[in-house]
């Protein structure tokens, strides 16, 4: 008779259930003397049904009372709060799957892999838990009595790229619109891991629905994680779109106190722009324009553009030409190739590939997000890709945060709680100039 794997899995599931129930009984018995010693009296035993990663379990646990206070030691041991239907581990698993799959696909995956049924609303609630944890972790920073500053990265070059990711969102009035997610990427170069594979060193990504907050978070990270010296070079790359121009990165350079800054007009976007513009004109002009860029000869580019102007026949063509000419001449310095700046091109222009993990999950397929939900999902995707989502759920910071969890956060209360100011710099935008002002607290 052939081995029945399905039947074996069913038997193992039942064995796990019985073993779990036994451990609950053992824990209840072991904690009883401690509860009595602390003045609690056992009232009764009540049942509860919870979905775990190993199945749906109905179990009975003791209820203890001291005065008006009631405790369920088993619930605390399992990390279960009042009315909690899903275990913390299962919530984490749902959130992890949701960073890669649609909510309905997560339900199917959980059903196939875990042999339990969850709803798409449960998956949605799991992502909301992530949003809440992200807020708590950010809030927790201001309650620290003592903080060990992170070990600063010593790097001669800091690479920084920025771009936006457009996603479809809905407002409270069910109005649909497009929202731009701000995405910044920081790294210190590339490292070869196999013959044909390279990875970014010290990679860190920041994403937010608010452009200003993303920039503040970026500066906060750079100040606290990098050792800036007179030899540090800030190498930036972008498509020069709104919010990601050279001026934006120059403000960062000034705030960091970096002396040398090299900004690149992203090669992919630049080539696409040139190719699109020269499509109606002779191919020779396109080749000469590319040569002007590769050799960084501005007079040659101006000659090519003057030749194009002589071929213009309509007003629409002239408007397109004038806009293109202005942008090319104004930003020509940013088109200088890396090799002519004595820099390596490796590690430049990687933002589009870093976008994919977000766009594959959040764009197309008719998906719409709330503003808050879009921000949470994008951050969740980034955490999952660097294996930090589990730390958000079960890291030591959560235990340290518990004493402050129910306290209202304010500057005055924070000052009372913090004996010594944490060695963290915080930033805000200048009211008139729009430039960042640093505040060490």
Regions found by a protein language model. Give the residues of each.
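N-terminal "assembly arms/tails" that initiate or stabilize quaternary assembly
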Residues: 14-34
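Catalytic center-proximal scaffold of phosphoryl-transfer enzymes
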Residues: 1-21, 64-441
């Amino acid at each position: 008779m052939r081995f029945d794997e399905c039947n074996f899995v069913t038997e193992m599931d039942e064995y796990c259930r019985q073993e779990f129930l036994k451990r609950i009984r053992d824990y209840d018995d072991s904690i009883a003397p401690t509860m009595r010693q602390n003045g609690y009296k056992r009232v009764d035993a009540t049942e509860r049904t919870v979905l775990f990663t190993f199945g749906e379990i109905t179990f009975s646990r003791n209820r203890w009372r001291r005065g008006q206070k009631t405790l369920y030691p088993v619930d605390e041991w399992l990390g279960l709060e009042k009315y909690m239907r899903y275990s913390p581990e299962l919530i984490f698993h749902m959130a992890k799957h949701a960073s890669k799959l649609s909510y309905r696909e997560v339900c199917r995956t959980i059903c196939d892999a875990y042999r339990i049924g969850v709803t798409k609303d449960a998956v949605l609630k799991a992502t909301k838990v992530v949003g809440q944890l992200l807020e708590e972790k950010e809030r927790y920073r201001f309650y620290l009595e003592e903080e060990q500053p992170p070990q600063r990265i010593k790097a001669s070059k800091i690479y920084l790229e920025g771009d936006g990711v457009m996603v479809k969102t809905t407002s409270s009035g069910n109005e649909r619109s497009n929202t731009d997610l701000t995405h910044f990427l920081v790294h210190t170069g590339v490292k070869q891991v196999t013959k044909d594979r390279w990875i970014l060193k010290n990679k860190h990504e920041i994403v937010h629905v608010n452009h200003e907050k993303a920039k503040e978070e970026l500066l906060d990270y750079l100040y606290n994680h990098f050792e800036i010296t007179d030899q540090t070079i800030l190498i930036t790359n972008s498509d020069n779109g709104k919010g990601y121009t050279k001026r934006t990165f120059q403000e960062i350079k000034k705030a960091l106190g970096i002396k040398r800054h090299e900004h690149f007009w992203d090669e992919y976007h630049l080539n696409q722009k040139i190719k699109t513009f020269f499509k109606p004109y002779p191919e020779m002009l396109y080749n000469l324009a590319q040569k002007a860029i590769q050799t960084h000869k501005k007079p040659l580019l101006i000659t090519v553009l003057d030749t194009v102007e002589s071929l213009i026949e309509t007003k629409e063509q002239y408007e397109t030409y004038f806009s293109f000419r202005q942008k090319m001449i104004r930003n020509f310095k940013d088109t200088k190739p890396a090799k002519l700046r004595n820099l390596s091109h490796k590690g430049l222009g990687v933002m589009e590939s870093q976008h994919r993990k977000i766009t594959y999950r959040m764009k197309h397929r008719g998906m719409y997000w709330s503003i808050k939900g879009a921000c949470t999902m994008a951050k969740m995707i980034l955490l999952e890709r660097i294996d930090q989502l589990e730390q958000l759920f079960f890291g030591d910071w959560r235990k340290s945060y518990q004493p402050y969890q129910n306290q209202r956060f304010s500057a005055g209360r924070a000052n009372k709680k913090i004996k010594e100011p944490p060695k963290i710099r915080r930033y805000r935008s200048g009211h008139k100039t729009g430039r960042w002002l640093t505040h060490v607290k």
